[in-house]
């Protein structure tokens, strides 16, 4: 009974505590509801300056066109000291921020901006509002709205295009494997550490809640680092280099231990992942929704039509090779062979005479090396390159009825007779 009474007393005390905590909320809500919210309208090209907390809203005045594919609309808040800028969807959200909401309180940390802030506005948002909170009265800040071409969106589109069309090549590249592994290790080292600690902790443990909170804290810290990246690079560059060196080496060692992908299925999964990331980058980089979908569909169809086109081209080449086989060359007759030999010989001799008569020809050096300079001089002047004796010997050897022709003719007959004599001998041996 005592235990039950104590338990009931604890429940009563907790209920009273919660009631006391929630008691001021209705009065606070009634105060904020009665108070009219002041909102300052933002216009393109106009800069406003204040030194106190204000609410600002931008309302879309025109429909996006096809020329706004890579156009950005951004709100820049620049201040002399540290401020807090929170982005919301509309004026109703600004009113809700005046009341205390636990979820909005934590989500505002992920949306808040510090000091020099850039808030990007979606072209299709009818209204975008921000709240600038100033802690000191001597803090001055300016708010400006600008609109124009964003080269970063175009760069993201090109990256998505390359990832989609060259995903297969990148998934098999060792350079891409190691560079991606090192980059992921540098950017997500804290998340990886929390993930490794979660593997070591038991499932039913109070540390699970701590790890879940650690993920949120890690994301928040990464967001703060990217916001203050310029200040970190200028003031703490030694620590930044040390961090990049250590984490980069550990990431490289981890990638080197497991090595690049070798299994074909794993490579295909990586290829498909890169292609999906490429399509996603192409979609988010284009500001006009229907144009973004059209570009994604065109890229997908172009990638898939590559295989049918390749098959059609291979089939066309095979059909062309079968139909258009080159005809065998026609053999020359004896008379054509002699005529062609005479024509080509005369042509070559004329070219040789022309070269010997040119200034580039070293006449004295050539004369010192030949046995009959007079015969060479006669040849250059137009005489025949053969003597009558050489002509008669050539006709005797290679002319009609010469020894060379007789050997060719009668040599074939003798070979046939020898084969006919060998066949009976082989037949007798086999018997």
UniProtKB/Swiss-Prot annotation:
Region (A): 176-287
Start and end residues of each stretch annotated as BAF-binding site (BBS): 368-375
Alphabetical keyword list: Developmental protein, Erythrocyte maturation, Membrane, Nucleus, Signal, Transmembrane, Transmembrane helix
Example GO biological process: eye development
Domain of life: Eukaryota
Membrane topology: Multi-pass membrane protein
Chain segments carrying region Interaction with banf1-a and banf1-b: 326-431
Signal peptide: 1-29
Primary location: nucleus
PTM notes: Phosphorylated.
Motif (Nuclear localization signal): 317-325
Residues annotated as transmembrane: 151-171, 175-195, 206-226, 236-256, 266-286
InterPro entries recorded: NEMP_fam
Cell location: Nucleus inner membrane; Nucleus envelope
Domain notes: The transmembrane domains are required and sufficient for its oligomerization.
Assembly information from the UniProt record: Homooligomer. Interacts with banf1-a and banf1-b. Interacts with ran-gtp.
Task of the protein: In concert with ran, required for proper eye development. May be involved in the expression of early eye marker genes. Contributes to nuclear envelope stiffness in germ cells. Required for fertility. Essential for normal erythropoiesis. Required for efficient nuclear envelope opening and enucleation during the late stages of erythroblast maturation.
Family from the record: Belongs to the NEMP family.
Protein name as it appears in the record: Nuclear envelope integral membrane protein 1
Native organism: Xenopus tropicalis
Gene transcribed to yield this protein: nemp1
